[in-house]
């Protein structure tokens, strides 16, 4: 059982209690923590759309600490990040692996960050199927199609050649924050909040 801290604020109407994530959402901060799956992705998408409706001009900050997860769930978050009007900055704390690294790279150019001890990992998608031979063949074609789409997304956001992306994603490829910057997944490694926007 996970305990979520509560924050109590004084208002003109008295005290108001929020769970910590709801309070941070008021500051336009969204957390992606843990495995990416459908229910979690729906909550993230809803938060992005809600914050756009609140103020379509104001930046949204996305903090990522995720081992990755379901590709289609992650792509629903990715597509929403690209779809909405506000700029979405991304920050890796802990790890951004697999689909987590794709979301990290998908932040607004110039606004993709990682803390110094973050770990970023990219790789090709994986899947396991059983059943009739024809069904296995269908699923194999689907996963190859998804692999191609993910490669294209990394090419778009890193500026790397397709051949470079394919070679780097052949197996689990772990990177320190500085290497992720060199690869183009992030724009800057930051140690303090004040470092954001400072060159």
Swiss-Prot record:
Organism: Ehrlichia chaffeensis (strain ATCC CRL-10679 / Arkansas)
The name this protein goes by in its record: ATP-dependent Clp protease proteolytic subunit
Subunit structure: Fourteen ClpP subunits assemble into 2 heptameric rings which stack back to back to give a disk-like structure with a central cavity, resembling the structure of eukaryotic proteasomes.
Record Pfam families: CLP_protease
A cellular-component GO term for this protein: cytoplasm
GO terms, biological process: protein quality control for misfolded or incompletely synthesized proteins
Listed PANTHER family: ATP-DEPENDENT CLP PROTEASE PROTEOLYTIC SUBUNIT
Transmembrane annotation, as ranges: none
Positions annotated as active site in the UniProt record: 98 (nucleophile), 123
Disulfide bonds: none
């Amino acid at each position: 059982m996970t305990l979520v801290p509560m924050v109590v604020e004084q208002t003109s109407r008295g005290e108001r209690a929020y769970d910590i994530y709801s309070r941070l959402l008021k500051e336009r901060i969204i957390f992606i923590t843990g495995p990416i799956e459908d229910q979690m992705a729906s909550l993230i998408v809803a938060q992005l759309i809600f914050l756009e409706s609140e103020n379509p001009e104001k930046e949204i900050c996305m903090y990522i600490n995720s081992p990755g997860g379901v590709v289609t769930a992650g792509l629903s978050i990715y597509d929403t990040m690209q779809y909405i009007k506000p700029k979405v900055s991304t920050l890796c704390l802990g790890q951004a692996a697999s689909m987590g690294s794709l979301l990290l790279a998908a932040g607004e150019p110039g606004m993709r960050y990682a803390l110094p001890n973050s770990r970023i990992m990219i790789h090709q998608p994986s899947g396991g199927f059983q059943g009739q031979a024809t069904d296995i063949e269908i699923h194999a074609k689907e996963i190859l199609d998804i692999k191609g789409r993910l490669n294209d997304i990394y090419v778009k956001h890193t500026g790397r050649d397709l051949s470079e992306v394919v070679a780097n994603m052949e197996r689990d490829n772990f990177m320190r924050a500085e290497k992720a910057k060199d690869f183009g997944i992030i724009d800057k490694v930051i140690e303090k909040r004040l470092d954001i926007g400072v060159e």
